Structure formats: C-alpha cells, structure tokens
Amino acid sequence: MRTVVAIILSVFVSLTAMPVAAQRVDAKPSFKIEYQKFTLPNGLDVVFHIDRSDPVVAVNLTAHVGSAREKAGRTGFAHMFEHLLFLESENLGKGGLDKLSARIGGSGANGSTSRDRTNYLQTVPNDALEKMLWAEADKLGWFINTVTVPVLEKEKQVVKNEKRQGVDNVPYGHTQYVIDKALYPADHPYNWQVIGSLEDLQAATLDDVKEFFRRWYVPNNVTLTVAGDFDPVQAKKWVEKYFGEIKRGEDIAPLEKRPGVVKETVKFFHEDNFARLPELTMAWPSVEQYHPDSYALNVLTTYLTRGKRAPFYQVIVEDKKLAPEVTMFSFESELAGQTQLEVRAFADKKLDDVAAAISEAFAKFEKDGISEQDLARIKAGQETQFYNSLSSVLGKSAQLAQGNIFANDPGFAAKEIDAILSVTAADVKRVYEKYIKGKNFVATSFVPKGKAELALSGSKRAEVVEEPIVQGAENEVDPNVEAEYEKTPSTFDRSVEPPYGAEPQVKIPSVWEQKLRNGMRVFGIRNSEVPLVQYEIVIDGGLLMEDINKVGVANLMARLMTQGTAKRTPAELEEAIQQLGASINVSAGTEDVRITVNTLARNHEATLALVEEILLEPRWDAKEFELVKQGTVAQIRQIQANPNAIATLRFNELIYGKESIRSRLPLGTVESVNAITLDDLKAFYAKNLSPSVARMHLVGDIDQGRAVKSLAGLNEKWKAKSVTVPTVKTPAPPTESKVYFYDVPGAVQSVFRFGYPALAATDQDYYPAIVMNYILGGGGFASQLTQELREGKGYTYGINSNFSGTKVPGPFTIASGVRANVTLEAAQLVKSIVENYPKNFSANDLATTKSFLIKSNARAFETSGAKLNMLENISKYGLRADYVKQREQIVRGMTVERIRELSGKYLNAGRMYWLVVGDAKTQLPRLKELGFGDPVRLN
C-alpha cells in the first residue's frame, strides 16, 4: 500500500471483517448499485456510476495483477510496482500526480496491492475529472520510460521501510509469512507475501520492471471506474480521447484455481522480539472467492467466535479465561482460500491449554450446531453493512471495480449478499465437516522472546528472516538525477494539462441545534443519501476526571456499559442490538466518554431505547467486570512492546510532564487496572456522567422534529447534575532542544516523535498555523518532509507533521518511522528542513497550499463521518455552521510573508523534544551528532 489506509473493496469482504450488526429480517431492500459499462477497442473496461449528492468524483484504475503473477525470486514485485507508478510519467513529470492532486484539492493519490489485483484511486472535485483521466492515462501509457536505475533503487528502500514498519518491527508481524509458507506449496503464488522479501526486493532490476509493466499493465487487463457527480456522455469522450490510443497487450489467460494443501498437521513456533503475549494461530485450506461454500464458511466463522453466544467465546473467554477474545475468519482470494483461527492468550498461558479449549469449543458446536435464531442474527447485518459501504464514491468505485475484475460483473456484490442470505444451518454444519473437522491444519505459536515453553507441544522453530542492523548497508541515491529517455508518441500533445470544468458548487449542510431541558445540546444534519442514522453522545470528562493514581476507571466503565443492562443480560443486550441492524459502542478517551451508534433509520427509536438502557441502567455485572479487566491488562501489555505506542506515550510524558493526567494512557497501567474495583466504576459513573456536560451529534435520514421527539425519554430520565471538567495546564515549550532515547533492542526501525507544546484549537493562530504546516508536513506527498525523506532519500515509508490542540494547547508533532541505520541522517534532515522552512517557502508553495485547502472543500461533507466531524467542531469549539467558509477566507488572505512569520513563531528546531524509539546499541551513540548534547536515555 502507498499509505496505511484501508479501502472497502466489497460490500461483503467478510462477515468477520467488522462487528456484526442486524436488520429486521422481514425487510427486503434492493442491494443493486446502478452502473454503466463499456469496453474500448483496446480492451479497457470502463464502469460509470452516477451519484449527484456531492460535487466530487472518484477515479479508480484497477489492474488484474498482484503478487500471484510474480516470478520466483522476484517476490514483492507487484507491490513495488504500485509504488513506482506514482512517481513520474512523461507528461505529468516527476512527482506530477502528487502535485496535481494537491493543486486540484484531491484526497491524495493512493493505491493498494493484494494477491490478485492492484488499484490506484482518488477522490477529486468534479471540475478536475478531465485532469484525472488525463493523468491516469499518462500513467498507463506514458510511464515506463521514466523509470531509471536511481528511481528503482530509491523506491526499493521505501518499500523495504514499509515492510519494516508493518511486518518486521511489530508484534506477530511474521505470522502470516509462516502460515502461508506451510499452507501453500513452494510453487504456489500464495506461498509468499504481497510485501515480498527484502532479498528479492533488492534483486529487482530495471529489465524486470519493464517486462512486468508490458505484460500486465495493458488496457485489456485493467478496469477504469468513475463514480460521482459527472456527465457520463462527456466523460466517455474523455476516456476515449486519453485512453483510446494505448495499445492492447497480449491476451492474458486466467490462472487455474488451486487450493492449498496440508498433507499433515504442522506446528511452528517463533520467539517474537515484540510480543508480550502468546498467540496461537491455526489455518485450514478452504475455497476461493465466489465459491458457493465461501458464504457458509463466513457464517460459520462468525458464529463460532463473535458475540456472547459464540461457542469459542463461551469456552475460551468465559469458562477457561484463557484470552480476552477469539478471532476466526474465512479469507478467500482468486485462486484459493483459507480459514484462520487466532487466539492471543493472557500472559504466560500455555498454548497447549488454548488448543485443548479450542477442541472443546469445536465439540460444543458439533453437539449444538447453529440455531435458526443465531443464523438470522448473523444474516441480519447485511442491509446496514451494505448501506455503510455506499457512504463514499471512493468505496463505490472500488466495489464496482472488484466485481468487474473478478466476476466480470461490476454489480456482483449484490449477488454475494443474496448468497449469504440463502445460507442454511445445514450449509454451516456441512462446510464445517468438509473443511475443518478432523482436517489437517497449520499452527503457529508466537511467544515472547525467552518463553518457548509456552508454545504448542510438538512445534518446530519457524524459519523467520530477521534483518540485521548494519550501518551503510544501503547505497545513497541522488534524487535529482534527471532521466533521459525517448518520448512515447501520441496523436495529440499530451503535455498540455486539460482545463478545469465548471467550478463545483459546494453546499454547506444545514445544521439544526436544540438544547434539551436536561441541558444536553443536540446538533443535527439531515442526510437522506442512505436510510441510516449515525450519532454520538459525547460526555465531556473522560480521563481528565480520573485520579492520577488510579488511571483506567473511565475506560473500564465505558467497556462495561455495553455488557448488559439492569433489564438484560450481556447476551440479551447484544442480541437486541443486532436484531435492529445497529451497532452501539461506548469508549473513553482523554477528554470525553463517547457513545457511538449506527442504525437503520426505520429502527432509530428502538435503537435509542437501548442506548437509554445502556446509559441510564447499567448492569454492573461482576463477572463481566473481571473479563473486561483481564482484557484491558492484556491490551496494555501488548502496547508496552509496540514501538509506535511507546513513542506516543513517552512523547506525551515529555509534552505534559509525567505528573500530568494528560500524559497518561486512558487504558491505565497494569498496576492501576488491577487495583480498580467495581465500586470505583460506579462512583465515577455517578459523579461524572451528566447531560449538563453532554453533546449529541446526529447525521442521517431523519428530520429535526422526529429526532427531538425520539429524545423525550432521555430528556426526562437523564437528570442533570453539577459536573466541572478540570482544566489541565499545558507546560511551556522547552527552552532548548534535547534528544531523548527509548531502547527497543533489535528494532529495525527507529520511531520519531519530535515536537513541543503548541497551540489550543481556539487560539486565533491555530488554523493559520495549520495552513502554514501544509507544505512542511501536513500535505502528504506534497509536503517537504515526505518529498525529502521518502521520495528523495528513501529513509521512510511515511512522515508527517501536525498541530493537535483541543480546548487546551496540544503538541506540534513530527512523526515517522525510519530504517534504523539512517536514524541520525534522517533526524538531521528533519532538523534542516524545519530550520530552513521560513526562507525556503515560496510563492509556488503558497499557490499549492491555497489551491488544495480551498478546492478540497468540495469533499468536506461527503460522508456521514465528515458531517459528524463538522458537528463536533461546532459543538466543542463554538464555531459557526459556515466555519469552513470563514477558514476559506483565511486561506485566501494568506501571503508568503505571513507564512514565514507563522513558521518563525511556531517552528523552532532549537526548542523541541526530539524523541527516538529504537535500538540503543547501534543508534544511541550517533545521536549526539544532532547537536543537542548527550541524548537522555529513558529506559
């Protein structure tokens, strides 16, 4: 992936991919998405979907190629190619797509690679559609000559950094590698990971790149999807103009379906440098995507592990108390599928005991089967899930492309839902017996380093390749070398960027507001695009209301509130929520406790009645309290070993001071959580939860009158009390910079958190400072930090900077993860960029900043989530409903001189905390060269 962003690729990726909601089973909605499809003479499939709700369009280019089409010894190539395709093309120029995206106010060019496909997608204001089609065509037809050896060598480092960040430097990162190596034969294309191996990535040559492109990136292997507010007649003409002359490639034969083979059960173990809890994973070969049995397998895995009625929950979590949760899913790809079961046990639990409990849970299922009631409950979430997938044109475009690529039917997702709704109890039992019961499997035990005795008996050591840290192991690449190449001919001058279309008319949503008699303020936006209602009740306080010596009370209270009510057992409450097509979650953060709800509009009142029960009639179940405590302790233990989590926690301690409640993790510590009693939760609830400090944000297919009427019960029953949320002072910035180092032995990446206590969101300079930061590190691939550290040097997979104030000053932060052996060099480069930012900021930078921040307003209110965020800003900070327009005027009035003034005021490399989390043995001594004295070691 280009960025760490997940995109919904199907209405039903897997029932196990998200919490199961529910609908009334007697409802029979249409799951059809309207589309138009045509094919150019060169074989390019084009799919259009019209959505007039917002002045935006999503453009999605999907190639039917992933890691399954790679050659042995060149693993990771499809994914690396995804990276290369963003860098340059003949007419866009170097970094042209990212520069274009910034200028037109796009969401940012993004992409992802799977085993079987690679996609490139972005949402833009609809006046830029022709520009995007021109750009995507340039990538497909006028790209390959721009790839040179220096370009390839630099991007290898970026991809290797992505692997370090997502696989090598995180707990359990190598699990799937071990599973797939055993599940599929060596010559099976699913035997290796999409990210590939570091050795294979380094071995890739320029000839490999060109061969791969010419074989797979041809029109007859690509689908172009456009979804949003546009003229399809005009768009078709543009598609024909820009894509039509790209030559068709050789015909591509489909690969044969080839399920995994496990001739005998095999068990492996690995002592994980970052794991603090033992984890058992079991995997069985199953079926490929769209296989008739895949839908019953998804129902099976959901029933076995999700919810209070699940056999695995009852045995492993409630009875044996071996783990806080169990996860099982059926994952289908184009050629084969696999069913996996994962149990991350509590500290020091033997995985043999977990395996015995798994057998007991399977036996329970064999005895009891699945009831019609449970089957209906699992199916019930499909309507809500479907409508949630329609919340953005980007999601729709990806969904349509997925269906076209793999089923030759853009609307195939609707057939998948019908297939799920047709699954019977007999089907569920049959697929269990066919694919799971008594069948050979692969098992992995990932245990903390030094605790091999926790692994499953009979396990052999897994062969995991772990990268050594060697200074100077990678050659530096000059990013300024210009490629010399012969231009690819065209029938017209493609170097001329198309003009904008008609300027989009951005309509700010109409906001209604009402204060209830009990003091709660309600803010709403009617949104009738889909028949859903989404809302959140935000109760100010959260961590800020806690005793610093017993942190974690608010979090435990929030988690316990959904574990039953005075009227309903935990299982009964869960079932009632699911039967309404709803999800209800309660969480606690630093500044608030938040109830988040998603439901079908027709079930709004019934869902709200359950919210009332949860909020006003907590069960305070002692058994569930102990389970929640155990799960929280397990979560804390794991966070303590994650370098990114460590960096965030230690940075907060530097920013706020160790004695400030704001420096603490809302989860608490192992010691504080173990000391908390049920009476502590009751006392916190009684003292701090009041409508007088509550706000409700509601977006959905419901008008103000109905919404307010539905709140009559909550208005009457929830009595106000006097609650004062303390104001915790933020310290002043440091008077001089200092380097702080937290040691994670063997870390192959160093995690950076550089910054200082900065501004409150209510400060008059706050939004201007955000504008100032756009080119520094807030603009993604348009930012200097990304262009220098990732695109120029290949030091990192990603880096950003931001201001994160609330009602009180919050930090300015520069965050990244860099390969360990350039820790000093990367920090020096960041320091140089910050120091020189005022004088280097140019008129072109200002134009890019203005263009993005103004034009991106066309996307500002597209999704329900965006509208909820708008209401949050209004209710929390007292902003006007048209604050977006007010901010637009600030941007229009910005000058280079003002940016330089702001950067001089709020960017001072000499008054920051410079925190590094990494391998002290190899990196700590070098950091004195950063010029801030001897580093302070934190552990």
How would you name each of these model-derived features?
Residues 159-166, 258-271, 378-389, 599-600, ...:
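Short, conserved secondary-structure transition motifs
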Residues 1-4:
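Positively charged n-region of N-terminal signal peptides that target proteins for export
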Residues 19-46, 231-272, 279, 314, ...:
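Proteolytic maturation boundary segments
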Residues 84-92, 99:
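Metal-associated gating/positioning segment near the N- to mid-region
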Residues 149, 156, 210-242, 440, ...:
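Non-catalytic, conformational "gating/processing" segments within enzyme and secreted inhibitor domains
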Residues 6-16:
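Bacterial N-terminal signal peptides
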Residues 47-49, 54-72, 76-80, 95-142, ...:
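M16 family metallopeptidases and their MPP-like homologs
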